[in-house]
Amino acid sequence: MSPLVAATFLLAVLGSYSTAASADVASSSTFPVFTIAKSENKNQVQYVVRLDDHCAPLGPSPVSAYWRMLEQGPRQTAPLLSREVEAYGLASQVVLARQSRGGEVRAVLRALPLRPVTIETSRGSDGACRGLATASIAGAPAHLFNVYVHLKWDGVDYLLLQGWSMDGSHVVRERLTR
């Protein structure tokens, strides 16, 4: 099954049953890396990476996702529901490196299994931890910041991957359709 067909199916079941998932909601040790936005409302799925005091990935599964409920207010959040994990959850993640000033994680989204995301973490010159997601967009590596899901009445019309070029000079976009 193609990633877009899988995403279509998974988004179609979003209106079914509701139970809470075990996703972590943002805290002081989580840092945002990219989002998924949908055409139906302003809410977004925020992907974050949990970091230790050295800005290195914390634990064996440091990447998680939660809802930013922007329709309810700028600071409202909610965990992903178990029925939403297939559409927005991670198929896998592995910590590739932990160092004294950062690290690296490879994560694979269930909806985009052929587009692994590499998250590099580091401490900036201001002393703050940072996470930067890199994925292939339009055939080249780019710093992923958003996946936009354009819905139609019977599922997903297209996905739009958006990221900054590696040199930061322009936005790179790729539209994925069936």
Where are these regions (language model features)?
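Short, solvent-exposed mixed-charge patches
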Residues: 177-178
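N-terminal export/targeting and maturation segments
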Residues: 21-83
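Hydrophobic beta-strand residues in large extracellular and virion-surface proteins
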Residues: 36, 49, 96, 107, ...
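Sec-dependent N-terminal signal peptides
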Residues: 4-14
